[in-house]
Structure formats: C-alpha cells, structure tokens
Amino acid sequence: MLGDGNEGMSTIPGLNQIQFEGFCRFIDQGLTEELSKFPKIEDTDQEIEFQLFMERYQLVEPLRKERDAVYESLTYSSEFYVSAGLIWKTSRDMQEQTILIGNIPLMNSLGTSIVKGIYRIVINQILQSPGIYYRSELDHNEISVYTGTIISDWGGRSELEIDRKARIWARVSRKQKISILVLSSAMGSNLKEILDNVFYPEIFLSFLKDKERKKIGSKENAILEFYQQFACVGGDPVFSESLCKELQTKFFQQRCELGRIGRRNMNRRLNLDIPQNNTFLLPRDILAAADHLIEQKFGMGTLDDMNHLKNKRIRSVADLLQDQLGLALVRLEDEVRETICGPIRHKWRTTPHPQNLVTSTPLTTTYESFFGSHPLSQVLDQTNPLTQIVHGRKWSYLDPGGLTGRTASFRIRDIHPSHYGRICPIDTSEGINVGLIGSLAIHAKIGHWGSLESPFYEISERSTGVQMLYLSPGRDEYYTVAAGNSLALNQDIQEEEVVPARYRQEFLTIAWEQVHFRSILPFQYFSIGASLIPFIEHNDANRALMSSNMQRQAVPLSRPEKCIVGTGLERQVALDSGALAIAEREGKIVSTDTEKILFSGNGDTLSIPLVMYQSSNKNTCMHQKPQVQRGKCIKKGQILADGAATVGGELALGKNVLVAYMPWEGYNSEDAVLISERLVYEDIYTSFHIRKYEIQTAGTERITNEIPHLEAHLLRNLDKNGIVMLGSWVETGAILVGKLTPEVVKESPANRLVYDIVGIQVSTSKDTCLKLPIGGRGRVIDVRWIQKRGDNDNPETIRIYISQKREIKVGDKVAGRHGNKGIISKILPRQDMPYLQDGRPVDMVFNPLGVPSRMNVGQIFECSLGLAGGLLDRHYRIVPFDERYEQEASRKLVFSELYEASKQTTNPWVFEPEYPGKSRIFDGRSGNPFEQPILIGKPYILKLIHQVDDKIHGRSVGNYTHITQQPLRGRAKGGGQRVGEMEVWALEGFGVAHILQEMLTYKSDHIRARQKIPGTTMIGGTIPNPEDAPESFRVLVRELRSLALELNHFLVSEKNFQINRKEA
C-alpha cells in the first residue's frame, strides 16, 4: 500500500471497523443473550403465562432513509419484532403472535447513529476487568500489607487482606471487616469443607478460636454475623428469609457477579476449572484466593499490575447497547406483570392477544434516553473528515463505572509498555483529562473477551511465509517482539547481530534469532492523527500531541489542496470517512450535475445523490463535487465525487504556502504570524460556514409577515408566509421568521366599550420573531418548515440555514502539522512582504524562535521538502521512521531533492551548499537583502476553527446579575469585560485613575451613578462622581450581617474632609 520498497507490509483495515464489528456483535449475539434472560410471567392466580421466544426475532428495514431522518429530525431506526406466546393453563391453549416491542437505532455506513436528526457516536470505555488482583502497600509503620481485590462485573469491589499474624479478613466496607471463615460459611461451606479445599489448613486453624468457632457453627449463625457486620446493625438480629434476601440483593448480587469475562480471569489467575456458565463468586473462589494471598505474604507469588492492558477490558458499543436492551426488557417485564396481575385483567371481555400486553415505549424511550444523555454517547464531531473517523476510535477511562479527572492518579494516565500497538502514546486530550481520553492505535481491534489486540508477524524457521497473528496483551509479553522501526526488518540486512525488541514490559537489545514476532508497520503503535504527521520521529511528543488535536480542528477550505509532503494514509482516511462518493459497481456515466450523478450498469440506471451545502454539527460546510464526466466508463470502487477537505480522493485539510522563518518588526513574536494579503484576495484560506436558526410555533401562535410596530424595511426579506426568502442577504438583527404570540388582555371599560360598539374583541399580540443574533450575517441557502406526522397539535419547526463566507483575518488561528500554531497578527500588502530571489513574495512569516525550544524539527524537513516538491511538481509520501533504511535518511532525502530542484529550475539559490535549505531574501519595503540567509519552504498550513468572528464581542448596555448588579459573564449572554486584580494593578501602574474609577463604578455595579450617565451624556454635562458604596459592597455587608457581624463604613467628603456616617 505504501510503496514497492516496503516489502511485507500489510494493508490497513477499515478505520470504522471497530464500530461496525461492535454493532454486528450486538445484533448477532447481544439480542439473543438478553432475550434469553426474559422470564416467564404468570398472573396471581397462575392461570395465564406470558413468554418471549428468543429463537424467533427480526429487525425490519427502516421506513425512512438517512437523509429523511436528518431532514425531519427523526431517529433512523428499525422496528424490533419478537415472537411471543400467551398460554392459558386451564385450557392449555396458546396464542402465539409476532409483536413489536420497540425501535432500535441502526448504525449507518459511517459507524454513527442518527437520533432525532443528529449524528451521534458511542465511544469505547476502558474499565478494570472483573477478577482478582493482588497488590502490596506500606502501612503507617512501613510494613507491607498484602491485599487481594475482587472486582465484580458491575464494578463492585471486595477485598481480602492478611495481617501480621497471617489472619485473613474480608473487608466488606471501609470500616467493617469479617473473618474469611465467616464469609465462606455464610456462602454455604462448613468448616470441614473449608479445610479440605485449602492448601494451608494449619494457617486457617491457627486463628480459629472458640468465639470464631461459634460464629461458623451453622450457616444461620454465619449469615447473622455477616449481616451484622455488613449492615452495621447493633443488637442481636434474628435469622429470617427477608434477612437472607436483603443480604443476597445488597451484597452477593452486586459484588459477587463476575460475568463471563470475570469467570475466565478468575479461573486463569487462581488455576481453577469452574465452568464458564457459572458466573457468580463461589466459596471455592474465596478459598483459592485466600491460598494465593498466603503465598503472596510469604513471597511465593507475583503481584498484579493494575494498569496492564491484560487487566483491562473494553466496553464497546456492543456492550453498551446490550446493557440498555437488558434495562428496557426489565421495564417491559414490569409493564407486562402489572397488566397481567392488575385489576384490569378481570375486565377483559375477549381473549387478549400478546400485543395487547406490550407497548413499544420502554425499548424506544430507553434507547433515545441513552443516545441523548449518556456520557459515552456523543454528538459526532464533523469539523472535517479526519475528525469524523477519529471520533469513532476514541477511548475513555471516564464516565459511569470509571474514573474521574480529579481523582485519577499519574500512574493511570502514564504510558504503559502494554499499550504498544494498541493505544496511541501520542494522541490524547490536553488539560485535566490528559491520559484519560485517547485514541486507539491504527491496527488495534477489540477481541472476543473485551481485550485490545494488535497484529504481529510471526518469525518462524519452519515456515518461509509470513503469518500475521493478533495477540492480546496477556499473550505477547511471553514473546520477544521486534520494533517496526528496527534496521534489521529489511530483508537485505537481516544478518544484523542485535536488534531492539520488547520482552515482558522491558525494551532490550537481543539477537535476531531470538525474536518471535515483529511489528507489521512502522507507525503501528500510532493513532490516525499521529500517523498523518510527516517526519514525526523528529518532533517532541508534546508537539506531536498538539498536532494530532489541531488537525481535527482544521476547517475545510473552499479551494482545498492536497499536501506536497504526506505519510500515505491520506487516501484511506478520506475513503473511510464517508466524505467521498464511491461507485458501488461498474458502469457508464449518463449525466452529472451538482445534485446527483446518473450512471448505468447491468441494464439499470442508478442515481447517486450528492451532498450540497449541508451544515455539519460544527457549522462547517459539507459539499461534494463531481469528479467524473459524462460518457466515461467507471470501475467498482472508483471515486465519483470529492467531498469537503478532499482532493482526488485524498485528505486535504490545508494549503501549501510559501513560508519564511524570520522575525519581522516584532509582529510575529510570541507565536504571532504575519501573512500576505494574497491569502485574502485570492481566497486561499476562505471557508464557508453554515449556521442553523430555528423557531417553533404551537397553539395559537402564527407565522405572518404583518408585524405591527415594525417598519416596512425590516420586513423586506419576508415572503407572504412570513418566512425569509431563499437567496436573501441578511445582517445582524434581520427578521428571519415573523411570529406573533397572543397575549391575555385584561378586561377594562375601554375594551368593553369597543366590543359593545364594534362587536370586535380587543386582542393584543406580542412580537416573538426570530431575529439574526449578533455575529450572524450571510446568505439564506435553505428554509425548512417541518411538522411531525399524524398530529396537528404538534409544534411546527421552521429552520433557516445561512451560509457565511469567511476570509482569513487578523485574530484567526493557523497551525502546521508539527504543533507550530499561531494567531494572525497583521496582514501586509504583498509588495511589503519579503520576497525571494526570483521575485516571489512569501505568504507567511513564522517566528524562528518557535522551533529550537519546542524541538519540533520535523517542520523544517517538511518545509524544505515542500519547496523542492513545489518546484519539481512532485508529491512525497514519507513513512515515519525512515532511518530504518539508512542513517540520516530524512536529511539526505531533503537535500537531494533540493539539489535536483536547483538543477532543473536553474536557480542556484534553491540549494546553496554553504547553508543548505536557506536562501538570501529581500525586504519588500526597501529592496535590501536581509543580513542572514533565511529558511524558506512550502509547509502545509491549516486554518483552524478558532476564528475571531466567533470570539470577538462588544457590549454597551446589557443584562446585570440580580445579586451583585454586575454585568453578566460571557459572550453568549452578552456579558461585559471582566476586570480582576491584575487588570486593576496594570491600570494603577499607569496612573489612569479616572479609567479605573469608571471600570469599578459606572461600568460595574454602582446603580445610581449608572442611571445618571445616559441623561448626562445626552445634555453634554459632566458625569458626577459616585458618592455612595457600590452594590457589591452592600452585598458584603449583608453577608456579614447574616453572620451577626455589623460593618459600618464612612465616606470622606472632598469639600470639607468631614466624616459622614452612611448606612449600607
């Protein structure tokens, strides 16, 4: 895939494969497993029995298409039918019927679900795998304390600990612990069975005293003792069935259910052979765990690494959907039981059918609630195609049953050797969740037991062929695995003596004959985002992390351009993202236009609809452009249309622009960027953004273009229905939808007189029009008037879509692919920009001080190689870690290409041996050359979604908080500028007393002074100085009064300096 020279390399699997496999596993296995748990339901008289037959169920093809579901804000789902039976025991008759129990949201070709018209995706969660784990900690006396933690399938934890006297305790809470003999007896074992099933019975007998022997004399005594400790109940409780039931519900069901994975882990760790279908904790498990704990105490066992991936499990979309189905079936069971056992059954006049007992509400509402509110169900990030595909490969330690950002330790966040080839060590979030949210490696997949697996090539002397195996984290630590960037991986130099390899979480240097497996790709252990960074091996990991995140923030441009220097993954990322239109079979193009492509094949004519100016969840523009011509024959899999941020079927997030690394009058200090006006006038970095504005009408509200008290020019864009016309240009404050809401009118003599004379009831309406908010301007490209089917009382929804064209401007954020980011500080005329020796002015000027301290030298290689590629009209696809072929391979490649470009273009300044990669350039203002040679090149620069149009904000008059009377905070609320301590110090330092007084009084919380300003300003008078305390000070006084503290304050008069007492 990546070139003929990369022999033995594997093609990369579908990047959406994890989501697809999870959903298919839910359909194939999860539905059957949950239906098999549905019990038979009988009425109170045991005359009627209801049951579901798990063998016969079906999912019906959706009634509507994906596009219609998005357009109408509905759920793209399939009806779930199950065969059910209603048995009358007295007559032995059974009515069997296929019933509808609800709708299940389906997964589309992008690996996402459409719920209420919104694309949503379920991310993977990493949890501690159920089983038992042994660890050692030091107590306050610096003595090692050994514990064994049993984790249930639901996340509940119980601990076994051994003290100095080798007594073993089971801790059921933080404060309460009981003897392991009492726990085993409460679970049904007597003393003889306990001693027969342990390896060290003498240790168990050593702490068995008379009092302890009485507690385990019978199962009832053990249960009473256990209940007294577990429930913290005083006195002498009496044994009863209700006590056993409560103990079963609160302890054994929550903390002792191991599940399928937990039973497998428990058998492996404790060397047991308990059947897999026995998923609950048994006395045999407890006793075996105690034996291993004794061995740990005396140094005969090995402790567990809780952060090793073999001790983790992946909770994928299949597990989450199956859990929700189980929850919905429990609710359905309660509903059916209430119907059968309720008083309404005596009123049945005819024989009921199974469908009469079941409604689709429990299943449908459960899934809609899950997709709408569960933390692991997120709105799909559609900023660009890369973002969409990376979002489905995310994993998280957080959310239900997991960790929190404030309590997670550094050890959990850190990189672990078992992450090799499974979890990307680079790509993670920044901030408080660093190390807790990340991306899967490019080849990782989820195994049958919920573990992350990675592929490796097996090296065997018996077979000459290459065999690829997927290894789980527990298996590969028993083998030596050679790294993918090793020199000895090339077949020509396999006689190297030693190679770097990994064995048992250690990185060693061993002989090639001792290697069992080797990696299949050099970037196998990176995520998609990190694999798109060229020369990543020359960058610091922190900057690579930033680049992985910033590539997902790149805005699709109106004229995209594929990168000169890439890694080779750009085509597959674009293909798997769903942004392209692909031919599903061979045929011939009949016609093409902006809306659809018609092509004929096998006697049929197919129509492929194209995406036209569709708004994404991030307000970016999604649009497809045909790439085939009429009459052209196409093959299966050929690209028919490019999407947003794709060119020729490859990912294209930015532009190749001419860049110089030099200081320029201080305008590019501190990561600021200087750009040429060419980028503005030639629409180099112009992007389109589509915003959605909507309004609902219900009841007596009406949409109209006749709005009283509004001037005609404000309604000029409305049609006869009161909705803005397509193609209209609208500015801030423009009316998009005219709407009137009736108000209740108080009865008055004047209104009664009008009614008596004219016979018309006086009514008033309130103006509730939809207006374009601050910052909104553009062209109306779509209007949708939607009403839900089947009910006229449902509120109507009107959506207005406005397209906004944004050129690059001062305040926008740009970034490269190496973590080199900056804000546009100044736009210079092209004649003032520094220019090359051939007269071309540069497009951007970066600060050279941003390279050495941040150690992202990869941008220098990309910059120089891009210059050579631009002159030679070549595109390069560089696989990371190219030094595995030759030392200094990156430097040699760049210099050789620059030398060839210099020869072919007859421009010796392209490659000058004295300072290769640099050139003498000239100041555009004076024409004089700069003193030092300057690095110039053509890197790939992205325009990010952090744009000044979304951030800039101004306020003159707005809302205030009720308590402190200070302006609100934030742009969304129309808030004011915040002035804190440091801002006050800065103003004090410059001695601007009047500005400081305005900030703290008139513009803040001084109510009386604030009210005098408008009138004083209109008549041109002098604004009086405030003479009383501001409102925040009054709040402080009232707070102190609530604590029974009286605070009196005094104001000094400027005229006579006499002290006057003022009450707050």
UniProtKB/Swiss-Prot annotation:
Keyword Ribonucleoprotein in the entry? The reply is no
Which reaction(s) does the protein catalyse, per the Swiss-Prot or TrEMBL entry?
A: RNA(n) + a ribonucleoside 5'-triphosphate = RNA(n+1) + diphosphate
Question: Which subcellular locations apply to this protein?
Answer: Plastid, Chloroplast
PROSITE patterns given in the database record: RNA_POL_BETA (PS01166)
Query: Which InterPro entries has this protein been placed in?
Result: DNA-dir_RNA_pol_bsu_ext_1_sf, DNA-dir_RNA_pol_su2, DNA-dir_RNAP_su2_dom, DNA-dir_RNAP_su2_hyb_sf, RNA_pol_bsu_bac, RNA_pol_bsu_CS, RNA_pol_Rpb2_2, RNA_pol_Rpb2_2_sf
Q: Does the keyword Transmembrane helix apply?
A: no
Its predominant location is plastid
| Molecular functions per Gene Ontology | DNA binding; DNA-directed RNA polymerase activity; ribonucleoside binding
Superkingdom of this entry's organism?
Eukaryota
Report the EC code(s) recorded for this entry: 2.7.7.6
Give start-end of the signal peptide.
Answer: none
The enzyme's first-digit EC class, named in words, is transferase
**A GO term (biological process) for this protein?**
DNA-templated transcription
Q: What cellular-component terms does GO give this entry? A: chloroplast; DNA-directed RNA polymerase complex; mitochondrion
Identify the keywords attached in UniProt to this record, alphabetized: Chloroplast, DNA-directed RNA polymerase, Nucleotidyltransferase, Plastid, Transcription, Transferase
Q: How does it assemble?
A: In plastids the minimal PEP RNA polymerase catalytic core is composed of four subunits: alpha, beta, beta', and beta''. When a (nuclear-encoded) sigma factor is associated with the core the holoenzyme is formed, which can initiate transcription.
In terms of PANTHER family, this protein maps to: DNA-DIRECTED RNA POLYMERASE I SUBUNIT 2
Its job: DNA-dependent RNA polymerase catalyzes the transcription of DNA into RNA using the four ribonucleoside triphosphates as substrates.
Tell me which family the UniProt entry assigns to this protein: Belongs to the RNA polymerase beta chain family.
Annotated protein name in UniProt: DNA-directed RNA polymerase subunit beta
Organism this protein belongs to = Jasminum nudiflorum
Source organism phylogeny: Eukaryota, Viridiplantae, Streptophyta, Embryophyta, Tracheophyta
Q: Which gene encodes it?
A: rpoB
